[in-house]
Amino acid sequence: MSTKNPSEMPRILVLHGPNLNLLGTREPQHYGADTLDAINARLVARAAASGVACDTFQSNAEYRLIERIHDARTDGTGFIVINPAAFTHTSVALRDALAAVDLPFVEVHLSNVYKREPFRHHSYFSDLAVGVICGLGARGYDHALEHALDTLTAS
């Protein structure tokens, strides 16, 4: 565990979009049995073990996610992991917020969106993301976090 002052640590922001607060109970055949709290606790602990702060935030409201992305410009965030959930296919505003802050990010989806309904095949974020992880369940967040840690600790 790092002994750095948390305000001096590099920061990763993990954003969760709409309905992800229901993880563990909502359509487990698509999204798995892990709760959002369990996922967040695992990510925060893993980041801390590498001397990196990890903030997590979930909202069902698009504007709250946008405001949190805007805050990342000035709060020391160096990397974003985002699961935009249903906003993946609809939100130009979230895309514009990510483009405006100009921070590297990985897009995560619990399910394989390409094995689901055709409307889920389009993402407004993928072309801006440094990477996209889908279909690996909650472990997709772990892989995204490892990439973020590698990126932040290499610089």
From Swiss-Prot:
Its EC number is 4.2.1.10. The active site is at Y31 (proton acceptor), H109 (proton donor). Homododecamer. GO terms for molecular function: 3-dehydroquinate dehydratase activity. SUPFAM superfamilies: Type II 3-dehydroquinate dehydratase. It comes from Laribacter hongkongensis (strain HLHK9). PROSITE patterns: DEHYDROQUINASE_II. It holds the Pfam family DHquinase_II. It is an enzyme of class 4 (lyase). Pathway: Metabolic intermediate biosynthesis; chorismate biosynthesis; chorismate from D-erythrose 4-phosphate and phosphoenolpyruvate: step 3/7. One of its GO terms (biological process) is chorismate biosynthetic process. The record marks R26 as: Transition state stabilizer. The keyword Phosphoprotein does not apply. This is 3-dehydroquinate dehydratase. InterPro entries: DHquinase_II, DHquinase_II_CS, DHquinase_II_sf. Belongs to the type-II 3-dehydroquinase family. Transmembrane segments: none annotated. Substrate binds at N83, H89, D96, L110, S111, R120. The gene is aroQ. Gene3D superfamilies: Dehydroquinase, class II (3.40.50.9100). It comes from the Bacteria. Keywords: Amino-acid biosynthesis, Aromatic amino acid biosynthesis, Lyase. The lineage of its organism: Bacteria, Pseudomonadati, Pseudomonadota, Betaproteobacteria, Neisseriales. The keyword Lyase applies. It catalyses: 3-dehydroquinate = 3-dehydroshikimate + H2O. Catalyzes a trans-dehydration via an enolate intermediate.
